[in-house]
Amino acid sequence: MANEACPCPCDIGDKIEYGAKGQEVQIEHIKAYVSKPHSSTDKAVIVVQDIFGWQLPNTRFMADLLTAHGYITICPDFFVGQEPWKPSNDRSTFTEWLQTRQATKVEKEINVVLKYLKEQCHVKKIGVIGFCWGGVVTHHLMLKYPELKAGVSFYGIIRDVEDRYNLLNPTLFIFAEMDHVIPLEQVSLLEEKLKVHSKVDFQVKVFPKQTHGFVHRKNEDINPEDKPFIEEARKNMLEWLHKYIN
């Protein structure tokens, strides 16, 4: 996501070479990546892509990480066949590109995904996580869908409008101290407003010395100084989901 006028700097990060363990499926009008644990479960997590699309190996790695901890995961194509953003794209066209990929207009796709999880996977407990553009989607969904029992929003842009703070279920917000897209003043305002308006559990956490995309776009093997922060953020995600959808 971006502070509206310029693309998210996710392309600064590393593209993980990763084969993925799940499979691609067609669910009504959308495609999705689905990963299932070896043992049966009634718990699932929806994984929402960044602007680089549902097929990005980094996002599928995160989905499979959750699957390794016992969750069915699904990463739908929320762009519904439209091209994801490419680092080579002309940045001046980003605002126009984003108009047909609005993070707050995903209800049709989410309804299809929820139906699939409940009817085809027999899921009873559902959470959602999202990165960048997907972080905005996650925040939006946690305001609209009570069946989503927990959310983790990673570095999603913050919009200061009054209907953004009445969370329906517990939500963890993770940000990076050195994120040039999301000023820390906005993060502080989000936390202040949530303290006033939210009636459910939430946490806003800022990781020092980290940049936008660090949890899913940095390869800890070649960024050893960042490894403790990457691992801590992923651990926080798992703990949050375990606490609220188990």
From Swiss-Prot:
Annotated gene: cmbl
MF term (GO), any: hydrolase activity
Gene3D superfamilies for the chain: alpha/beta hydrolase
Subcellular location: Cytoplasm, Cytosol
EC number: 3.1.-.-
Name used for this protein in its record: Carboxymethylenebutenolidase homolog
Chief place of localization: cytoplasm
Protein family per UniProt: Belongs to the dienelactone hydrolase family.
Alphabetic keyword roster: Cytoplasm, Hydrolase
Annotated catalytic residues: 132, 179, 212
Organism: Xenopus tropicalis (Western clawed frog)
PANTHER family the record matches: CARBOXYMETHYLENEBUTENOLIDASE HOMOLOG
